[in-house]
Swiss-Prot record:
GO terms for molecular function: prenyltransferase activity. GO terms for biological process: menaquinone biosynthetic process; vitamin K biosynthetic process. This is UbiA prenyltransferase domain-containing protein 1. The lineage of its organism: Eukaryota, Amoebozoa, Evosea, Eumycetozoa, Dictyostelia. The chain crosses the membrane at residues 39-59, 73-93, 124-144, 156-176, 180-200, 209-229, 254-274, 276-296, 310-330. It catalyses: menadiol + (2E,6E,10E)-geranylgeranyl diphosphate = menaquinol-4 + diphosphate.
Amino acid sequence: MSTTINRNEKTKQVVNKTKEIKTESSQQQQQKPPISKLMGIILATRPWSLTISVTSVLVGSALAFREIREFDSIMLSIILVGAVSLQALGNVVNSFYDCKNGNDTKEKSADRTMFDFGLTEGNIINLIWYLLIQCAICLGLMIFRMDNIKCIVENILPLGAFGFILNISYTAAPIGLKYIGLGDLTIFLCFGPILVQSAFISQTHYHDSLAYFYSIPLALTIVAVLHVNNTRDIKADTEAGSITLASKLGFKNCYYIYAGLYLFAYIYLFKLSLDIDKYILNLPLILIPKIISLINQFKNKKLEDLTEKTGQLSFFFGGLNAIGVLLSMQ
């Protein structure tokens, strides 16, 4: 009898130790390793999204080369760094004010910049200043490289100022365009007409409305990135009292908008190809199977990683768009 009791006690001890080991193991898995400050700063800029500004610059530069058959690689480098810096600045300011305004909290926010990256509020403010200075340096280098006062005063400075104001005012006080339903329009203008035209002017030294028209298809795919993000955040934005297009439309209508953005992007791209009788402009058509996959993922409400996937799609769309523009040279 005593032998049986001892065996039972030993069995219980083994079971308890096994449970303790499993508990410790699960706790260790839940505890994420600390992020270095440098990595935190990099993640705060949302590096996965920065390809958006790159593709806008590439489309504008490709169009410029098609029109004048000249190319300034140094100017391209300057405007690429400037565009990426400006977008990174907007991303960090967006994270900062979303947290300040209560849209993002540690418990519910998908954007972890203010919570998990080991950065203090002071670190974020310093990063904002650093990116501001970097943008100013790129603008100065661009002006110096162009050496065309009339073009700078009439085109570059107005476009740059307008784009900067829109970018910062997306979430920053006193306007907060995102919170009054104008976020989609803001992103469309910043990464479509404004940035594509700026890249075009930096190469040609003149303004052409053609750049605005050619920016539209890519801009629509970029708006799709924001649209997914805002659809995912409908509940959080509504609780914070923010009004976004997604929160006003509801999920079902957001789904139709998401699909419609791609549909209109391709329709407009096809129109551009008809205008110049160069169907190579429709090169992004090869992405349609991937787009259908993303639309189905949206329909099934699997939005967790859809923002990143939509951003990747926009990058490939823009890259193929730029190649199509180059290949459409007369």
